[in-house]
């Protein structure tokens, strides 16, 4: 079955690479990531999203609208993240500056695949802050009538034609889970970028 084929073999990676099993408020020692190539991200998000049957799916931002940021490489099969920081400590810092800080520390910004894994394992993370995922970037920037068909609230002005937007996960409307996007230079007191120390795969 799926677990025996894809997940159980990852156990051998833990024996060599981690002894830390302490879960703290903003620190998660280990996460299993199932990438879009194995299980579509929209399906994963729908299984996690609360009250999904009450929401019109055509107005939901789709995970497939994002791709890895330049220079970011992730496995195409299930893998592990070690030493995950949820982004709580990075609040009030724009995603672009967070990426630079992560690079200086030898850490990696989480992607949209990894963010969905994070809130699937630990949904309580979103009770304290929005989780920005600058390891991915928005690739679809729709305009005109197609905006509403694709789920965006408004078209992007010309000045943003070359701007970079990154995915963000948050709770709105009484714990309704939402995937959206944020400009990479936006600084907010309720949003922070998540990161990990390493990615491990077989």
Please tell me what each predicted stretch does.
Residues 1-108, 115-202:
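A binding-site-centric feature that preferentially detects glycan-recognition modules on secreted/surface proteins
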